[in-house]
Each structure stands twice: as C-alpha cells, then as structure tokens.
C-alpha cells in the first residue's frame, strides 16, 4: 500500500514538474542569439549588414550582432541591382503590421555598398586629428581667404551665399570654386540653397539663369510632378557645371497653412503627399549626381523663423509620428544622405535644448528613424543659438549632441574649441571617427572624391 502511495506521489510530482516546464516554455520569449544562428522571427524594420544573399533568402546582422534571415520570395529592392556581403542595408515590411507577416513583401534599400564603406575607412585611417575635425565644418565661404583657409583648416566644405556668387559669371565662379578644391587634400562639399521661389542664391542673377527657379508649389500647380522633376534635373545640371555638388534642399517640412513661416518654401500639401514629393525629388537628385539635404528636422510646422529667435513647439509626439516624420523617412528611403536639424525647441522631444543641440532629437534620428547618414546643424550663427549658448562653444555643444557637420562662420575659433574638448575627453575620438566616416561616405557616394582620394 505504501509503495503504491509513493508511486502515486511520484507520478503527481512528475506531472507537476512537466506542467511547470511546459508553461515556462510557452511564455518564455525567444532569446536574442549573438552567434552564427539566424533568427527567422524578423523585426518590422531592420538596419544591418549583409552576410549572405541569394535569390531565395537574405542573411544579415545588425550593430548588436543579432542575426536574421529574410525570405525574398516577395521582395522589392530599391536603388541596387544586387547585394553582396558587407553591404549596408535597410529592410522594412511593406505593410506596417507586426503580426501575420508570412508572405508579406519586404523592401530593401541599399544604404552603402561595402566598397564605399571600405574606401571611406581607408581615407580616414590616413588623416590626422586636426584634419578629421576640419572635415566636420561646413561653413560660410570666407571673403578673401577661401583658398588659404581651405588649406589651413582642411574644411569639410563651403556654403555659398549671395555675396559669394554675385561678383562672377559662370566661368568666373567655376574658376573660383576650383581654387578652393585645389587647396584641399580631400575635395570639399560646395553647397548652396537653391530651393526655388523665395530662396534662390544663384538663379536670381541673370549671369546664371534667365529667371529665378520657381517654388515647388508653383511648379506643381503648372505641371505636376513631371515639371518638378524636370526642374530638379535643370538645377543639377547648372550646379554641377559650376562645381557646386550639394543643394541644401528639398525642404521637407509639412505645411498646409499659407500663414506658416515655412509654407512658401514647402510643398504645401499634407504629410503623405509631401512624403511622395520628397522621395521622388531625392531620387531625381541622386540620378543627376547632386547631393541633397533634407531640412528642417524634426519639422517646423507652424513655428516662427529661428533666424530671429528661438521657436517653441508644443505639439505632441504623435503629431510628428503621424505627419512631420513621414517626408524625412521617404527621403531616407530614397537614399538621401544628409539631414539638417532645426533650432526650434520641440517640447515633446527635449524641452531644454534646441533640436540642433539635443541628444534626444539625434537619438530619434538614429534609433527611431534608423538614419545612418550625415546629420548637420542649421546655421549656428542664427539668433536662436546665440540666445541659448551665450559665450560657450556652439560647435562643441552640437557635436556632443550627435551632429556630424557643423554649419557656422566662426570656424577659426570653433575648431580649436572642438580639439580642446577631445583632449579633455568631453568628446571621444571614436565619435569623431564615426562622423568623419559618414562625411567621407557621402562624398564618395556623390563622386566628390574617389577611393584613392
């Protein structure tokens, strides 16, 4: 009798243990595997590096060394004919739903081919710290010392304003810009704001074009997207002929209210229509070999002009997710490689710092929107920043926040401040290397420099 009782107790214990084990397994989350094992439960959006690519499947790993397999039976590959090991890619399921992804098509965007990444690293390895920091400054062209300052500071680039183009004709300006390039070990970004409409640094002068370029809204009203894309091509041809390789455009802000400060410069449609416009314009700029800069992240909305003071944005974060971020995401997906961050203070993201100086805002760009290109400040000489920074170094603030490129005039003082911050361990040299690698990658992608520099 006692033996039967013991057997019964043993059976009950075994059943109980089995139940606990089975219950635990059913509720246990699948662990993240950091090995050669590839998970088939794939995230909705992924940025990573190709390990293997075939017609049937794609194996990739992300920056955390997590590995995933994507089935390619329904795949749309944008901007690349094939993928090879080491390519930097972004993958997204077409339908924005996490569950029931079986059979859903995915889209793949090539961020950077592995050979571009390797070429940028090779150039970076041969640079001094001073040269690296110089590359992080995209500055107003100095009057009278453009060539000598290019040689002295090895600047990342010059931005042209009215005063820089007005004295010349096409041949004269082209020759002047070439003198800057001749004094740079690493060829410079030469940028200009040629948005069309109210902002035309170049075409406002008859020496460069018979009439100023029209605004996106005016072009769309006259001829739809076909006329806009024709305009993009003409701008690119003009800028390239002069030696200008970056147009600080397109304006990616969502504005449907004519009274908004930014409205006349924006597309003037809702978020989805603006996103469609931005994607097509960036694609056209890439096809015509001109660098694009999406601006002004995270979106001006109905804010005031930060050229004259700090703007405070009280809109909820959901508003940005549903509207303002969409055009920027469309631009990133079309392989825009630079984004300009505005000076407005966006309360829901960071109530204490302007967006351009906010680590929170830059984290959103990197971790929420998965942007891997160049982040640059708006002009640090604007009143919005002067009001906030006081006598401190705006460049140090900007780089600590996560900016790769600093836009300013006072580079002769700002560059030594950044070098001092590195020596004092305020800024790590690893961060500098990562930023300069992105800048070099951008220059390689738009053919400013080649692998051998």
Residue ranges and their predicted role:
Residues 151-274, 296, 301-314, 342-357, ...:
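Enzymes and membrane/adaptor proteins characterized by extended Gly/Ser/Thr/Asp/Glu-rich
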Residues 180-187, 269-290, 355-376:
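Alpha-helix-loop-beta-strand connector modules within alpha/beta enzyme cores
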Residues 277-293, 323-336:
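Phosphate/pyrophosphate-binding betaalpha-module
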Residues 2, 13-63, 79-116:
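Short, flexible, surface-exposed loop segments at domain boundaries
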Residues 115-149, 368, 388-453:
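Preference for extracellular/luminal or secreted protein segments
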Residues 66-81:
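Beta-strand/loop nucleic-acid-binding surfaces
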Residues 134-135, 156, 185-190, 244-245, ...:
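Short, well-ordered coil/turn segments that N-cap beta-strands
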